[in-house]
Amino acid sequence: MKRIVSLLMVIAITLPLMAQSHFVPVIAVPDCPEKAHIAEMIKMAGCYPEMVDTTDDIDATEWDGAVTPDGWVKHGEEYSIHFYRAIAERNIPHIGTSKAARQIDLEMKQLPYEEIAFEELVRKAMTFKRAKNLMDGMLTIDTHCDLPEGYAKGYSVGKKTESQCSVQKMEEGHLDAQVLISFLWQGPTDDASSQKAVEKNLRQIEEIIEDVGKYPDLCGLAKTPEEAEALRNQGRKAFFIGVENGYGIGKDLGNIKKMRDLGVVYITLCHFRDNSICNTSSRHGSDPSKGLTEYGRQVVEEMNRQGIMIDLSHPSAGTFWDCIKYSKAPVICSHSGAKAVYGHDRGLDDRQLKALAENGGVIQVYSVPEYLGRSRSSMTIDDMMAHFNHCVEVAGAEHVGIGSDFDGGGGVWGCNGDNDLINLTVKMLEHGYTPTQIRGFWGGNFMRVMKEVQSIASRD
């Protein structure tokens, strides 16, 4: 009995010291009449209560969970607004009674305050803590973000605006790197129109370089996995550049080298319409069974030679199989899904998923509602995970990652911006994926392919 009492005393003494440790979840308790009682319940659950008495405490603290007894907060409206905003922006698991709380976390059971059961909050807080620890110990990347399309609206990597992507939101979501996209709508393929597309693409790439260059203390451009890792070690975010639509190559293969010199790491061969390189998977194309043109084969060969990844996210099935056949290097799908889960033309069927794995490539799963299921408005993070889990089951854990397509149509309940990406890690843990697999999902797999593609180019 004395030993048990002594052990309890040790736990009581050391628990506050462990609050910022690797293992003990920290749960925020707002300044309310019942906070002492709440704190005792949290301690009994094996967590550490963080008393939040001022708005400074709210802004300065990183929690793993929070209690939100609506209407009980002492400090008034401003304090409450800050408290709820911190929870919403940082995706903190919580339990509460307000309408706002239900909107923030639709899965949480809403009970009258005196009947609140803390077990679910504690479980979520512990999983959230594990997710943070994992993501903070690896290089994490989202491989498709269309933020540059919003430059005219004032979007910028260094500003927290209405965009789904920014350095600030990356920090909240524990994301280290992102691929920013120079996107081109498909136009006529005559020589003059193609040259205009080339010029527009190069101009957009320069705009990305300029935007990232505005914030040297926050981020930098990366052309290789090693450069991204170096930026992470410096405490800065890494941005790669991708091009969506080979229309930007024009009719001159020399433009591929120009793009590589500027830092482009992958090119999506086409978009929603056929072009001079290949046919599209979209219904707007002429025939999805058709693949690479003769010029398209030359493009694939030159991309291999320059060390630029071939992205098959929009091309037709015929193009997919042609690239599997003709490319000397692994290929990628930077933002795609599983056709077996929902039969949209943007998804890959199981035969393609298996071939992608045999090729050594990777599929990065998107968050675009209309590609995930029939009801756009009701799609959630669970629908995204259904595609993700199927891809893992068919292709293997070494060949799957995340390519959200944020600011380009991506975003569902629970995963609607860089700040929400940690929620995917929580879902991965709940599904039972191992830390090693999760490291692969969040960057290891994609970076492996990038290294191999660049290595093959250097050997040639």
Where are these regions (language model features)?
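Boundary at the C-terminal end of the N-terminal hydrophobic targeting segment
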Residues: L17-S21
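Short acidic/histidine-rich motifs immediately flanking catalytic phosphotransfer sites
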Residues: D59-D70
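Conserved phosphotransfer microenvironments
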Residues: K35, T68-R85
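Positively charged n-region of N-terminal signal peptides that target proteins for export
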Residues: M1-I4
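Bacterial N-terminal signal peptides
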Residues: L7-P16
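A short, well-structured beta->alpha microelement
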Residues: K43-I58, I116, L221-E229
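Active-site core of metal-dependent hydrolases
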Residues: L269-N279, H284-L353, Q364-P369
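N-terminal hydrophobic targeting/anchoring segments and the immediately downstream early-domain regions
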Residues: V122-S286, G343-I402, F406-D460
